[in-house]
Structure formats: C-alpha cells, structure tokens
C-alpha cells in the first residue's frame, strides 16, 4: 500500500501581507499529479489544515475543492485530523456522511483511537487517528487528576490502553511535539512526548513541526509544511512524504520534491548590489549589510523584488545591548530638535543645512506653544 503523508497545509495563510491561496492551489495541483504518477492509495493529513480557527471563505472553498478532488478524481482514501490551528467543530462538520466516500475526519480525542482498516495484498493495515489535544483534555479522557504528571506520561498511559494488534501493520496519525524532532525548542509553551510512546507501530505520521524530517531513526516522521510559511523556514527541507508499506516490518519512506509557485528566499548584501540583480518574483526578504539607513529602501527594492516580504539591517541589528542602552539613555536627554537633527543626518548621510534647522526649529517652537 502506498501512502502520502501531508501536514501543516495552513490553508488561508497570509505571508507578510501576501495571500498564499494561489500558491496553495498550485501546490495541490502538483499533489494530484504526484498521486497519479506514484499510484498513491491513501492520503494522510496530520493537522493544521487551516491557518486559523475561523478560516475565510477562500480557504474553506479551497479545502473543499482539494478534498473533493482527492476522493472523486484521484480516487484515494483520505484520513484527516485536526491540529492546534484548526477549529474542531468546523473541520468535523459532515464527517459522518463523508466517511462513506472514503474521507475520514477526526477532531476530538476519545478513550479509544479512531481506527480505520484497509486491505492490500499483504492483509490488513490499521490506521489510528490522534488529533491535536490539550493536556487537560487527555487527563479528562484518562480520568487522571494528578496536576504534576507530564504529557509524556499521559500519552504513554493512553497508548497502553489502546487495543493494538501488533501482528498486523499499524499506522498512527498525530499532531504533537515529539522529542527528537527538529525545532522542538521553538514550539514555545508546548510539552513534548518521547518516541517510546509509539513503540511497536509500523509508521507514525506526525504534523506540528514544519521541517520535513525523521525522529531519532525510528519510523516516526514529520511531513513538515510543504510550503515555506516564514523567513525562519527559508533553509528548511521541504517535501512530500511517500510511504511504501509492504509486509509487516517492511516500510520504505521517500521524500518527493515540492513544486512551489514561488519559493521563499532570504538574500543578503548591500542595497545597491541587490538592486542591480535581475527582477525576481519569488518571496524575498532582504538582509542589508549597509551600515546606515537607506532612503526608501523598501520601495526601491520592490522595483526589483515584486513580492518583497521585508528587509532588515544586519549591522544595525547587531548593535551591542550595552551600547544600545547608552544610546537610548543619551537620546532621552536630547531636545526634539536635536533628536530630529540626529535622525535626519543619519538617514540622509549629510549634515542638516542651517536653513532646514531654522524651519524645523520654528515648527517645534510652534508645537510647544500649542501644547502650552
């Protein structure tokens, strides 16, 4: 049985003011092609389907179109769970009716994992669906009131209560943070679980962390977000996770390349050098090496980089905190005119003329008079 493992689609995402709807539509078209080319039997979507709990109309329509195409045109089975960005009630709407078409959606944790079984030439494959849950929700399901128990201990207890048949092939789909996963420290405020929670399972399809990777050399994988969703992900590995589930204990995992409409790139250099490059319609963030602020830098950059996400100054950002504190303390003692003069001369890289100083002196004196 051949599976496609997706996660963290974040449909409806706004990337620094740019809607990714067209990019996501383009991605889905390439996924349809991959399904046909690789003869995929089943698609797993491991949470964070939407970017927001209350998605906009465009996002809802795109997800509906995506799922409808997977089931009706690609004729694959689809198993989908909710993530922390999803609204369980909205995503779960009509799920009972959809199951008859081969689309299974699970958005709430229950005492026993939702189990869906399909067959291939080697026998049964059991899929278990574990949507995103909070610690308090899991404690309520288990009937545990211990305030100090870790999430890892809770999940181990929960998994121990499940009725797995380990003589068969078992796949779990979840949305959580598994220690050993890249970027665990970056998921602030969330507790983790250990890979040992999933011992005995043939494949664990996870969502939540956005880098496509394997956890601790076990059959535990994060699909990652197929598209880059922030400048922090500019260097992350992205891909589509394809699993060839053969006989018991025989799993082959391959990462297929993602076809993106636009990539996300971080470019570094002096502004004039960056402006001399060919026009670029990718999503670009610029890190400037200039030691002074450049006039209208963003507007000038957009003439070359049509989808500019923003820019920053590497050397200005690297100012030592002690020096920055001293500068701020000094600035607090300056008059409005002196402060503005300093800003003007830094921005324009030239001394302010006496005529300009007189004009602004008159302006500030007028403002002071109005306030008094």
Predicted regions and their residues:
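N-terminal active-site segment of His-dependent metallophosphoesterases
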Residues: 1-68, 75, 357-371
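Divalent metal-coordination and catalytic microenvironments
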Residues: 8, 28, 48, 63, ...
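Alpha-helical scaffolding segments of alpha/beta enzyme cores, especially the outer helices
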Residues: 30, 61-69, 93-96, 100, ...
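Glycine-rich phosphate-binding loop signature in dinucleotide/nucleotide-binding domains
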Residues: 35-39, 120-122, 164-167, 277-279
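Accessory, non-catalytic peripheral segments of nucleic-acid enzymes
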Residues: 37, 42, 244-372
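His/Asp/Glu-rich metal-coordinating catalytic cores
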Residues: 55, 79-217
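Short, conserved loop/helix-junction motifs that constitute active-site signature segments
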Residues: 72-74, 164-166, 195-200, 277-279, ...
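A conserved active-site cap/scaffold subdomain adjacent to cofactor or substrate pockets
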Residues: 195, 202-203, 207-258
